[in-house]
A protein has these predicted regions:
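N-terminal carbohydrate-binding accessory modules
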Residues: 13-58, 71, 86, 409
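Short, well-ordered coil/turn segments that N-cap beta-strands
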Residues: 24-28, 55-57, 89-95, 157-162, ...
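The substrate-binding groove and active-site-proximal loops of carbohydrate-active enzymes
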Residues: 28-39, 64-79, 126-145, 167-174, ...
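Conserved, mostly hydrophobic/aromatic
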Residues: 30, 51, 59, 88, ...
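Short, acidic/polar
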Residues: 37-53, 144-150, 267-277, 343-351
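Aromatic-lined substrate-binding rim segments of carbohydrate-active enzymes
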Residues: 45-54, 60-123, 152, 249-256, ...
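Polysaccharide-binding and catalytic clefts of secreted carbohydrate-active enzymes
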Residues: 122-309
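Carbohydrate-binding surfaces of carbohydrate-active enzymes
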Residues: 213-216, 259, 290-293, 298-690
Length: 690
């Protein structure tokens, strides 16, 4: 019985934008909802003209069009879709066609109420909103298959169809009896015996021992919240269950349209699903990029740096295939607490950053604002006035022209000498841990800051999962990798012993893959020998509370959040010490030679100045190619068999002068050498032919 829940994953092909379209184009488009405007043929005709004027070459159709495709059960109408695709294709615009399964029609919920989701409080949803169907439901999957088969029958042969877009922003748990049953089967398949599960979950705590798998319930809000292993396995199951649902779509689509690639829109640092697992069902990955521009507590430069991390996180799901952004806003969103406009120049630079970080496409939500619904005030290329001479429309047109100039980079891949390890299981375990800072562990802030630190040194970095090979990297960073799964310690040990450099931080290797604390000291799984340190205690600082780190040259840097107390081995070099509190003089940063390589450890959350000292020393020792960049300038690099592409992005409002190699600036068409001055939110993309 459990075995039938293992999805036989499709072996994906290596699609690139060139192989998808048979032509070297960089995707420039947006989410288009003609189904909301069928009573206005004049607008539909004008849309295509305006798309062409704006430099668009793709449009995403049908994301939430199920009720228009199938207004009543078994009654289908795809005529408007075919007509729309015809108009677009005649104008040189390709269609990315969504399966409309992100929201079901009202008639379906009324006739088949068993497909409704059940929330964590045990209450069944009413029909409404989106992501509102149980992914386990056989009836829902049957209806999904029906609509997909009809879609393929109607437009699967259309020359403008270039990819399938599965559902939309997948996510959400379901706690219905059917999902609970599947969860128990999943647990049986994983643990085999109830004794093994009891040990892994440490159920002796608070007398929560299970006698049988049938006693197990999901972690309801008003139920079992004390077993961290249960909570983690529920998150893992939710990812597995959603991936199994996605497989039910991809398997059918690959059978019906084997030459049309499949993707979906992921959501940056999304907590609900493990994207390293979900990506197995996709031919390439896309994501929706909605940075929080204009926050008073965060600079534009920091926001760009966090976006660069998000690009690296998503592209790391499929490292050797270019990604693109499926959605971004040309102006503002409608769901932040305060919704500010992008400042002039930011949209263009955001698009260029996407390409610099390995993307082969930049697309918007939405093409035209809808007249009603909760997204009526969400930014769009075309506003309610329908004009093509607005500031936003001109901005998008100029951005698309700049993106078009980057056509030569299509299919090239980022050249990264360093990698950060990010693991969704570890993230979930840390967030659920009852300790440290209970509500906010600040993992995202830390991983983004350390990724930015590598970039400040001019070193591009990937963000990869724990299962990925480390062979291509000189430096590997383990930021707050709270969970170290059995065997990962040996992987790091071999990497360092063979000449690699690793940088570990506080909260490394506290628990195993069941959230049980490693015994014998931290970091566990043999990593103490690699780093030459043992973390004996952890001090958590209040917001606004700081310590200092003192370097041998007398310079100091600030510390916030966490301070680990270390014991060091005799052959471990102390690079910096605490400057305050009872642990003044204890090691904060260390270096340990191990085999042919080197292991650095940072025991506290230091500021950028403190991290810079340790990171530059580590990367210099590893032989990384470093640069000295002005504050606020990002550097990214892509490479293919023909050329190397160097990107320099000024994320500030002041001019910055950067040293560049000799080559052609693709954005201006001019030859550059030695130095280039970048204006406010300016950029250059230097192509150096091999």
């Amino acid at each position: 019985m459990p075995g039938r829940y293992k999805a036989p994953y499709f072996k994906v092909k290596r699609f690139t934008m060139k192989t998808i379209t048979k032509a070297p184009i960089l995707f420039r488009g947006g989410d288009y909802n003609p189904d909301q405007w069928l009573d206005r043929p004049d607008i539909l005709e004008k849309d295509v003209e305006m798309m062409k004027k704006a430099g668009m070459n793709t449009a995403t159709l049908g994301v939430f069009a199920w009720a228009k495709y199938e207004p009543q059960e078994g009654a289908y109408d795809f005529s408007w879709l075919r007509e729309t695709m015809d108009r677009l294709y005649a104008a040189g615009i390709y269609t990315e066609l969504a399966t409309p399964c992100g929201a079901k029609p009202n008639w379906m919920a009324k006739k088949y109420p068993e497909i409704l989701r059940v929330q964590a409080n045990g209450v069944t949803d009413h029909q409404g909103m989106r992501h509102n169907a149980c992914p386990s439901s056989p009836i829902y999957r049957e209806k999904v298959h029906n609509i997909i088969e009809k879609l393929v029958e109607a437009v699967g042969d259309h020359p403008g169809l270039i990819l399938w877009h599965i559902s939309n922003e997948l996510g959400g748990d379901c706690y219905c009896p059917r999902c609970q049953t599947r969860f128990r089967y999943w647990l049986r398949d994983k643990y085999k015996t109830i004794d093994a599960l009891n040990h892994a979950w440490w159920t002796g705590f608070w007398s929560h021992h299970y006698n049988d798998f049938d006693e197990i319930e999901p972690p309801f809000e008003n139920g079992e919240q004390s077993l961290l292993g249960l909570k983690l396995d529920w998150r893992r199951f939710t990812t597995w269950n959603m991936t199994d649902y996605v497989h039910s779509e991809t398997e059918l689509l690959h059978k019906l349209t084997p030459n049309v690639p499949i993707t979906t829109n992921l959501m940056e640092y999304f907590p609900g699903l493990d994207y390293h697992y979900l990506q197995k069902e996709l031919d390439f990955v896309c994501w929706d990029s909605y940075p929080h521009w204009g926050r008073p507590d965060r600079s534009i430069t920091t926001t760009f740096a966090m976006t660069a991390f998000d690009h690296a996180l998503i592209r790391g799901c499929k490292r050797d295939v270019p990604f693109f952004t499926m959605e971004s806003t040309p102006s503002l969103v409608n769901w932040h607490e305060y919704n500010k406009l992008k400042r002039p120049g930011v949209n263009r630079l955001q698009g260029l950053q996407t390409v610099a970080c390995g993307g082969d496409g930049v697309q918007y939500f939405q093409w035209r604002k809808g007249r009603g619904g909760t997204e009526q005030w969400h930014g769009a290329v075309v506003d309610h006035d329908g004009r093509d001479d607005t500031r936003v429309f001109k901005d998008v047109t100029e951005t698309n022209a700049a993106l078009n100039a980057l056509t030569p980079v299509i299919g090239s891949l980022p050249r990264a000498e360093a990698a950060l390890i990010f693991d969704w299981d570890s993230r979930w375990a840390l967030e659920d841990a009852w300790g440290m800072q209970i509500q906010q562990k600040n993992l995202r802030e830390t991983v983004c800051a350390l990724h930015e630190q590598l970039g400040r040194c001019g070193v591009d970095a990937d963000v990869i999962g724990v299962e990925e090979s480390l062979d291509r990297y000189k430096v590997v960073v383990l930021p707050m990798l709270y969970m170290v799964k059995p065997g990962f310690g040996e992987k790091i040990r071999q990497f360092v012993a063979n000449g690699g450099t690793v940088i570990g931080t506080y909260l490394l290797g506290y628990v195993n893959d069941s959230t049980l604390a490693w015994l014998g000291g931290f970091p566990g799984d043999g990593l103490r020998e690699v780093f030459g340190v043992t973390a004996t205690e952890l001090d958590t600082l209040y917001p606004g509370e700081h310590n200092t780190v003192v370097f041998p040259d007398g310079s100091k840097a600030a510390i916030q959040d966490y301070c680990e107390l270390l014991e060091t081995r005799d052959n471990t070099d102390v690079l910096a010490t605490y400057g305050e509190d009872f642990y003044k003089g204890y090691a904060v940063a260390t270096h340990h030679a191990f085999g042919k390589g080197h292991a650095y450890y940072v025991a506290a959350r230091m500021d950028a100045d403190g991290n810079a000292k340790v990171f530059r020393a580590a990367m210099a020792q590893a032989g990384c190619t470093m640069q000295t960049l002005p504050d606020g300038v990002e550097y990214h690099c892509r490479e293919d068999e023909r050329a190397v592409y160097h990107f320099y992005l000024n994320t500030t409002e002041t001019d910055k002068t950067v040293a560049v190699p000799t080559g052609a600036d693709l954005l201006t068409g001019k030859t550059v050498s030695r130095e280039v001055t970048l204006g406010r939110y300016g950029a250059c993309a230097v192509e150096v032919v091999k």
